[in-house]
């Protein structure tokens, strides 16, 4: 409908307004038929056209109507032309009730047509402001006056009904009116248009920004793909170079091992009855040293024999006359031409001095050979260890540099235990060297035993994963390979463990040993400060790693497989916790309470680790274990060696300070009630050099303690 109104020409709009206002148009002849048709086309909302005064048929009136007074051919307009009131008059003449269905329907359609038409005309935004504003203000009143001025063609009975119709039309028309003026509407339109332009501009900007961002995302995505491809190439090249380097190192190790087999020795298989055993055969280096020792021994024996003969030819002392028998013997020897005649005193001393010098030289040479022999023994230990490592590596299923978990490239075998292998590996993700411990279960085990071992390893992983201390080896990762094997990824340390160092060097200085003990105690203090606290239970030189392979560097503690968690359910601050794994561990480093057999399991606490610290410190200082040094674990268990270790004995050499001996005694107290715990161990004066010096120099109590400890040390050493 709005499109039809907009399509009218100005002349027809003026004619339409004249019909609403009742004012004639003097600008030319008016075609009433066309104007009525246009009005009906605009005002009709239903499919049935509204009846006009020309078309309506009055069934009630049978009289003839006058001819149309308005003649379009004459070109003049008369006041008897059809007005808008005629449409309302038709509506007023039809009663609201008592009509048939078609009449009621036509009345309802005519009633709804006019307000709709008026609302459409008022809402038309493009009408001229000067023409529409004054006319639109009086539309309502024009309808009422037009109805009053029109001649009534009905009786007085229809007057009230027509008035009610006029009121209804007037009310409906007022309800469709608005308080907004054309100026306000135009202002709102302008503001809306400006807002719309701003929004459209903002939308355009956002679209351009979105396009730019999409373009940048595409560029970054392409760059990311490019970098990923480059990274993959770098990783592939790194793997290739690492494998080549590992192969070269393996070849070099095997060449060196083959050379050392001739120089240091090798294992040979010897048959004993129905069984075969491996027997060690020394190489030519040891054989040469043994020959030199045999030569030195034979020369020493010869010198001793000559010294005895020289003693027989020793001249008598001054003032003593030789006996007659000696003279007769000398004569006989001279007559016989023998050379063992009596020497003069000067000749005797000269010959004696020569023999002494020769013996001294042989002794020095023997010491050098002994030192060389000890050095070769240390090298032989390395050689034997390398032979075993190469043998285990050649028989391993992981010898061909596999990549485990798509991340860890195995390089070479570090060592092998009962059910595990430790490989040096490279982490391709973090770009660092790691130690991968591969746990392999025996396929012949029962499922229950496999589950128990796996549960034990998971427990170790959970304990170790939460630890974060510079003196404890870090655990990075844990994953399964198959149903019978899984891996743990640990921090890699270049050096060896303390046990290997002691086998190579026997012992170390007190300063170096104290430095190692201080670091161990620092780690134990951390284990007892976390919640819940942890007992390591398996402290020994084999579980203490030397980072750079020397005794004057950093250490790290590893292997938490036997650790005990002191949670609230199992640990009592007075009695400790029950030892559920009695018989496990390394017996040389366990305290006596771990070997007590009774109806109930023994109670342990962190004092177990304190005892282990004392044993390790003693072994570092003296090169031997304080209890059961040359015994096996089975002998220690059968002979109750640790249960009998009520007091520690110190050898006279090497020389150790009284403070170190007192510290060892505090750690190796037989009764656990008399032994210090980890917290007291961390505050021990011996491990704090500045406090120890100040106490020994300024405090009389410290001097008294030092004197008593020195006296006790003297008494024990005596």
From Swiss-Prot:
Which parts of the sequence belong to the Protein kinase domain?
408-687
Record-annotated active site = 538 (proton acceptor)
Which SUPFAM superfamilies does the entry mention? Protein kinase-like (PK-like) (SSF56112)
Looking up PROSITE patterns in the UniProt record yields: PROTEIN_KINASE_ATP, PROTEIN_KINASE_DOM, PROTEIN_KINASE_ST
What's its top-level EC category? transferase
Please report the PTM annotation for this entry: Phosphorylated at Ser-696, probably by CHEK1. Autophosphorylated; phosphorylation promotes the assembly of higher order oligomers and enzymatic activity.
In Swiss-Prot or TrEMBL terms, this protein is called Serine/threonine-protein kinase tousled-like 2
Organism expressing this protein natively: Mus musculus
Organism lineage reads as:
Eukaryota, Metazoa, Chordata, Craniata, Vertebrata
């Amino acid at each position: 409908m709005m499109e039809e109104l907009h399509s009218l020409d100005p002349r027809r709009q003026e004619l339409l307004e004249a019909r609403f206002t009742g004012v004639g148009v003097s600008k030319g002849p008016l075609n009433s038929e066309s104007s009525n048709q246009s009005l009906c086309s605009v005002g009709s909302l239903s499919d049935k056209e509204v009846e006009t005064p020309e078309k309506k048929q009055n069934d009630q009136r049978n009289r003839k109507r006058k001819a149309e007074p308005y003649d379009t051919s004459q070109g003049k307009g008369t006041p008897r032309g059809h007005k808008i009131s005629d449409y309302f008059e038709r509506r007023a003449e039809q009663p609201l009730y008592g009509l048939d269905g078609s009449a009621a329907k036509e009345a309802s359609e005519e009633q709804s047509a006019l307000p709709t038409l008026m609302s459409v005309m008022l809402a038309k935004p493009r009408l001229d402001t000067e023409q529409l504003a004054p006319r639109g203000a009086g539309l309502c009143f024009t309808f009422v006056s037009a109805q009053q001025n029109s001649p009534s063609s009905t009786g007085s009975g229809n007057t009230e009904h027509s008035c009610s119709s006029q009121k209804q039309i007037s009310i409906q028309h007022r309800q469709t009116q608005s308080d907004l003026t054309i100026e306000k509407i135009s202002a709102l339109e302008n503001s809306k248009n400006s807002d719309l332009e701003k929004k459209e501009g903002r939308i355009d900007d956002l679209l351009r920004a979105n396009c730019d961002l999409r373009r940048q995302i595409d560029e970054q995505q392409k760059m990311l793909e490019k970098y990923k491809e480059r990274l993959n190439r770098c990783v592939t090249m790194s793997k290739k170079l690492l494998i080549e380097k590992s192969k070269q190192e393996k070849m070099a190790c095997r060449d060196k091992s083959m050379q050392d087999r001739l120089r240091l020795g090798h294992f040979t298989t010897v048959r004993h009855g129905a069984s075969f055993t491996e027997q060690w055969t020394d190489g030519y280096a040891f054989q040469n040293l043994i020959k030199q020792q045999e030569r030195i021994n034979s020369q020493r024996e010869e010198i001793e024999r000559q010294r005895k003969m020289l003693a027989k030819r020793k001249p008598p002392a001054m003032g003593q006359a030789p006996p007659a028998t000696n003279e007769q013997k000398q004569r006989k020897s001279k007559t016989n031409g023998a050379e063992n005649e009596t020497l003069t005193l000067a000749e005797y001393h000269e010959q004696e001095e020569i023999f002494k010098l020769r013996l001294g030289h042989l002794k020095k040479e023997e010491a050098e050979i002994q030192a060389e022999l000890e050095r070769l023994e240390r090298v032989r230990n390395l050689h034997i260890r390398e032979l075993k490592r190469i043998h285990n590596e050649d028989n391993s299923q992981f010898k061909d540099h596999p990549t485990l978990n798509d991340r860890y490239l195995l390089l070479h075998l570090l060592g092998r235990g009962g059910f595990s292998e430790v490989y040096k590996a490279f982490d391709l993700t973090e770009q660092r060297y790691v130690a991968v411990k591969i746990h392999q279960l025996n396929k012949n085990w029962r499922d229950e035993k496999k589950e128990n071992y796996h549960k034990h390893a998971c427990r170790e992983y959970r304990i170790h994963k939460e630890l974060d201390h510079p003196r404890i080896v870090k655990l990075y990762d844990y994953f399964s390979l198959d149903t019978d094997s899984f891996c743990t990824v640990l921090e890699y340390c270049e050096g060896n463990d303390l046990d290997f160092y002691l086998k190579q060097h026997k012992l170390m200085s007190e300063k170096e040993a104290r430095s190692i003990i201080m670091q161990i105690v620092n780690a134990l203090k951390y284990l007892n400060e976390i919640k819940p606290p942890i007992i390591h239970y398996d402290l020994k030189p084999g579980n203490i790693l030397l980072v750079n392979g020397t005794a004057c560097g950093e250490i790290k503690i590893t292997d938490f497989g036997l650790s005990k968690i002191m949670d609230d359910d199992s640990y009592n601050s007075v009695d400790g916790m029950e030892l559920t794994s009695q018989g496990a561990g390394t017996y040389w480093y366990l305290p006596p309470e771990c070997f007590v057999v009774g109806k109930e399991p023994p109670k342990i606490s962190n004092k177990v680790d304190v005892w282990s610290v004392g044993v390790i410190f003693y072994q570092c200082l003296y090169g031997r274990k304080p209890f059961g040094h040359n015994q096996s674990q089975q002998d220690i268990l059968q002979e109750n060696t640790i249960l009998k270790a009520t007091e520690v004995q110190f050898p006279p050499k090497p020389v150790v300070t009284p403070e170190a001996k007192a510290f060892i005694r505090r750690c190796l107290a037989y009764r656990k009630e008399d032994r210090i715990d980890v917290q007291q161990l961390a505050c021990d004066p011996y491990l704090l050099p500045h406090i120890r010096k100040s106490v020994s120099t300024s405090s009389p109590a410290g001097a008294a303690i030092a004197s008593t400890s020195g006296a006790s040390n003297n008494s024990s050493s005596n």
